[in-house]
From Swiss-Prot:
PANTHER family: INNER MEMBRANE PROTEIN YHJD, UPF0761 MEMBRANE PROTEIN YIHY. Belongs to the UPF0761 family. The keyword Glycosyltransferase does not apply. It comes from the Bacteria. It is found in: Cell inner membrane. Keywords: Cell inner membrane, Cell membrane, Membrane, Transmembrane, Transmembrane helix. It is a multi-pass membrane protein. It comes from Photobacterium profundum (strain SS9). This is UPF0761 membrane protein PBPRA3489. InterPro entries: UPF0761_bac (IPR023679), Virul_fac_BrkB (IPR017039).
Length: 319
């Protein structure tokens, strides 16, 4: 009984020591990578690339007749679930910008595509820097990955929304039990999509093999923080409308920038968590030698105690 208690305490201390070592290493890593500065840079690039990205996405959807009319549905879904405040204003401005972009010539549309590619390249560079990857992919491979994300990404999202809408129209969903389950699934869809997006980002973008369990944990942490920040940010904007008071009709600009900056902080934090989980040896050594299995052996501990007591008795006898 006493041995079990000692074993439990040792394991608890071991887990506590490992957790403290990991959090210390993670904090040091975040400071070294200047996460907040990198997030600000990515937010700036994102705002510059936002309209070109949406234009390319809508163009990819319109190229397939089966997805006709899904562009606006997808845009509404993204704004309602991923932009917590000033969603209608953002939607109005984006529609105007995209409509103006649609009037451009082929050269202008090509320039928009290049700008959208620059955003993908910035994401690639930021995440590979976090993973300490110095070897770059060949340009052909990078272009293929960016093209796949820009084309297949919206198609897959549009397909999921189309399937959800189709299932919602079936007579099979008339029963209360099935309908309730379907409604719960729809409510969880933004969380599932954000988790899947983070997981794919942490698995595919770094130019090295990332453990699925590490990427999954980082994605779950990032998606949880994303949902909490979405609700918290919306609550702050609605209860403390300082931006509207100061900027008036232009308040949507700083609101959108702050939100995009916060999103990139979460994305990069999830990447730091995922990358640091794969550096176990480094964060173990950063806090000294880890507790080994020998330290957890109760018999060894008891033997050490006996040796100490016998040495104390021998010293007394010598005196």
């Amino acid at each position: 009984m006493a041995e079990n208690k000692i074993t439990g305490k040792v394991h608890f201390l071991q887990c506590l020591k490992q957790t403290i070592a990991y959090l210390t290493y993670l904090n040091r890593r975040i400071k070294h990578d200047r996460l907040t500065i990198a997030a600000g840079s990515m937010a700036y690039v994102t705002l510059l690339s936002l309209v070109p990205m949406i234009t390319v996405v809508l163009a990819a959807l319109s190229a397939f007749p089966v997805f006709a009319g899904l562009g606006e549905l997808l845009q509404n879904f993204v704004i309602e679930n991923f932009v917590p405040a000033a969603g209608e204003v953002v939607k109005t401005y984006l529609n105007e910008f995209v409509a103006n972009a649609g009037k451009m010539t082929a050269v202008g549309i090509g320039a928009l595509f290049v700008v959208a590619m620059m955003l993908m390249s910035s994401i690639d560079h930021a995440l590979n820097y976090i993973w300490r990857v110095h070897e770059k992919r060949r340009p052909v491979i990078s272009f293929s990955i960016y093209w796949m994300v820009l084309t297949l990404g919206p198609i897959l999202v549009g397909s999921s929304i189309a399937v959800s809408s189709y299932l919602g129209s079936l007579n099979l969903l008339n029963s209360e039990a099935v309908n309730g389950l379907f409604q719960q699934t729809l409510r969880a869809l933004p969380v599932i999509m954000s988790s899947s997006a983070f997981l794919g980002l942490y698995l595919l973008v770094p130019n090295l093999k990332v453990k699925f369990s590490h990427a999954l944990l980082g994605a779950l942490v990032a998606s949880s923080l994303f949902e909490l920040s979405k609700k918290g940010f919306a609550l702050y904007i609605s209860n403390f409308p300082s931006y509207q008071v100061i900027y008036g009709a232009l308040a949507v600009i700083p609101i959108l920038f702050v939100w995009v900056y916060l999103c990139w902080c979460i994305v990069l934090l999830g990447a730091e968590i995922t990358a640091s989980l794969g550096e176990r040896k480094q964060w173990q050594l950063s806090s000294g030698e880890p507790i080994t299995s020998k330290d957890c052996d109760v018999k060894v501990m008891a033997k050490n105690e006996q040796e100490k007591s016998s040495e104390a008795e021998n010293n007394k006898g010598t005196k």
